[in-house]
Amino acid sequence: MKKIANYLLIEKTDDRYTISMTPELQDDIGTIGYAEFTDNDHLAVDDIILNLEASKTVMSVLSPLAGAVVERNEAATLTPTLLNSEKAEENWIVVLTDVDQAAFDALEDA
């Protein structure tokens, strides 16, 4: 099941929620040249997940859900352009667990 919030895609697989950028956001910000994850192991709604610099903007990516961070796309810190990829296995940002199912269900369907 996929949901969308803040130009981010959230895909639920079992109890894991993978957050990635929508193609619209990727297009709007341009080529990403720098990406830095925050060290938070638990996120609240609107906490910063990732700071990035792209050809069209500098921005912070905010979490659409609260949950525990179990994985970060650390490869994106070495190769930030991975976040521009069309491939889901390359462009993901973080994986969360311990997410409130009702909060996920309340998001817009993708």
UniProtKB/Swiss-Prot annotation:
Give the N6-lipoyllysine positions (modified residues): 56
Q: What outcome is documented for mutating residue 27 to A in this protein?
A: Total loss of ADP-ribosylation
> Result of mutating residue 11 to A?
No effect on ADP-ribosylation
Q: What is the effect of changing residue 24 to A?
A: Large decrease in ADP-ribosylation
What range(s) does the Lipoyl-binding domain occupy? 16-97
Going by the UniProt record, its keywords in alphabetical order are: ADP-ribosylation, Lipoyl
Protein name (Swiss-Prot/TrEMBL)? Glycine cleavage system H-like protein
Q: Which organism is it from?
A: Streptococcus pyogenes serotype M5 (strain Manfredo)
